[in-house]
Amino acid sequence: FKKLNMCMYIIMGLLLLLAILLMVTSCRSNALEEENEYDVSMMHTVGVSDVIDMFANEGTYVLYIGRETCSVCHDLLPALQEAQIKNNYITQYLDITQVDRSSSDWETLVGLLDVETTTTMDEEGETEEVTNTFGYFLDTKGFTPCVIIISGGEQIAGFFGSRSLTNFEDWLANYGI
């Protein structure tokens, strides 16, 4: 009976340890989900026609094109938010999932995003560098995140992918933001 009691205590101890471990893991998982929340509420949400209007104005705009289901967008978001606060501007946010990519407005916008960029594409294990316009990559590939600076009625700069806060702020400073 002593061996049976000892086994029962060991089994109960292991079960208790397992329960504690599961609770800690669950709490960490919830904390990570909250930490990675896709919160664009401090940005001004715009539609395609609004972006076209930015090209008709003389102002300077930081346009962020992203989507909640993009992990790299989640990575870039804290830098966008912090830079916006530090540099006192409002990011214009276009959610690519809300865009009718068959509309004439979209076709107009794709044409306005005429600055060329080079990106590495990996298709079926083969990588190649492709150079084309931002409009092309957004329209045909749906690449996000994308940050574009519009100033004086034209696209003056842009990038795809994520950047650190320091790198992003340096990039903005190059264009007077």
Predicted regions and their residues:
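Core hydrophobic alpha-helical transmembrane segments of single-pass membrane proteins
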Residues: 11-19
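Thiol-based oxidoreductase modules, predominantly thioredoxin-like and allied folds used
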Residues: 88-128
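Extracytoplasmic/periplasmic, Sec-exported soluble proteins
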Residues: 43, 68-75, 139, 160
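Non-catalytic, surface beta->alpha helical segment in thiol-disulfide oxidoreductase systems
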Residues: 138-177
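N-terminal leader/targeting and pre-domain segments
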Residues: 3-12, 24-58, 167-177
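Local sequence-structure signature of Cys/Sec-based thiol-disulfide redox active-site neighborhoods
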Residues: 52-94
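Extended, charge-rich low-complexity interaction segments
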Residues: 116-152
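Solvent-exposed loop/turn segments at secondary-structure junctions
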Residues: 68-72, 97-100, 154-156, 163-165
